[in-house]
Amino acid sequence: MDRIFTNLNLVTMKTDLSTPNDGYQIIQDAMIGVTNGKVEYVGHSCPEIFHGHPDVIDCGNALVTPGFIDCHTHLIFAGNRANEFEQRLQGVPYQDIARQGGGILSTVNATRQASEDELYHLAVQRLEGLKRDGVTTVEIKSGYGLTLYDELKMLRVAKRIAKLPDMKVSSTLLAAHALPPEYKDKPDDYITLICDSIIPTVAEQKLADHVDVFCEGIGFSVEQCQRVFDAALTHELGIKGHTEQLSNLGGSALAASMGADSVDHIEYLDEDGVKSLAKHNTVATLLPGAFYFLRETQLPPIDLLRKHHVPMAISTDFNPGTSPIASLRMMMNMACTLFRLTPEEALRGVTCNAAQALGLQSSRGQISVGMEADFALWQLDSPAELSYRLGVPDLIARVVDGDVFYN
């Protein structure tokens, strides 16, 4: 073993449904052995193993969890929309804001004008908040370019971020985020551009792991999203969707039936849609930050998701318009207080279920032999405190592929 971590209270989050009353899967007085960036040993402390080993890290009775995974972000963009926040609080309708040049297209304009270097440095700054909350993997979407050139630009920035030694990145193409001004009143033509030009180029250059869509009345229709999914699957890219956020169009059921790793938002999802997620083992990603920021009232169907055993992930949805909040622990708290998840469900939502939402469940999201050695060390007594307490610097360090990065 290259490195050994001792004297820790280990929250493995192993997906073992045979012990439903111990969902945290805690091992007291535990030890982790790491070889070549992967976990080789997990269990109770064995002094005969680590005695005399040259690289032993005494964790001082720290609480250790899998590294957190923020599985839905729009981290790369330029500009901000604080002025729209003020307008909304004064009662100005979003439609009026959009007519004034605001809304998502204001972010599109700013992002198109920014260089790759500018976008990179802005995104790296935003990552700091996620790092402080124990995040070791982040998903990053495009979607503020809406041209071939600018979508590629955003995804190249995500690839640069992935070279950081202390953060792993999963990249998602979200060209079907909004209708660009160049295609006003021509949504089918824009979908053709995505399917025939953007997706093939992204796949050829290996710039994305998934393709996402915004399936809504103010976004794209179910039929248009199906075209995008077909093109993505043809080019061997995973799929996921922004679905049932504002209405129930059936986008979640479509995405699940086509093999989506996750559907996200899902406030208006009905029981038939939930059953489809369960049938196809698709994760429901909850985004309480957007729910809170937009002062929504339609709650996601948590009881139905539990009833049908659909895994629930939690993410920040970090973006300039509806969730400018770079704190995954705040999302855990909101998921508990607003959506009535338990702290155990919240922790599962940012570890093993978040890994599944990105198709990474075989390598991340739990601490077990063979998994990547990504975990977080906390100065806490109980895993419930991760959802309970906010704003206190509880993180001691993050470990990425066995390398330690102190907070």
Curated annotation (Swiss-Prot):
Domain of life: Bacteria
Record keywords, A-Z: Cytoplasm, Histidine metabolism, Hydrolase, Iron, Metal-binding, Zinc
GO molecular function: imidazolonepropionase activity; iron ion binding; zinc ion binding
Positions of Fe(3+) binding: 72, 74, 242, 317
Gene Ontology cellular component annotations, sorted alphabetically: cytoplasm
EC identifiers of the protein: 3.5.2.7
Cofactors that this protein relies on: Zn(2+); Fe(3+)
Record bears the keyword Metal-binding: yes
Binding site for 4-imidazolone-5-propanoate: 81, 144, 177, 245, 322
Main location: cytoplasm
The protein's annotated pathway: Amino-acid degradation; L-histidine degradation into L-glutamate; N-formimidoyl-L-glutamate from L-histidine: step 3/3
Pfam assignment, any one: Amidohydro_1
Residues binding N-formimidoyl-L-glutamate: 144, 319, 321
Protein family (similarity comment): Belongs to the metallo-dependent hydrolases superfamily. HutI family.
Purpose: Catalyzes the hydrolytic cleavage of the carbon-nitrogen bond in imidazolone-5-propanoate to yield N-formimidoyl-L-glutamate. It is the third step in the universal histidine degradation pathway.
NCBIfam families: hutI (TIGR01224)
Protein name: Imidazolonepropionase
Species of provenance: Aliivibrio salmonicida (strain LFI1238)
Lineage, top ranks: Bacteria, Pseudomonadati, Pseudomonadota, Gammaproteobacteria, Vibrionales
Gene name, Swiss-Prot/TrEMBL: hutI
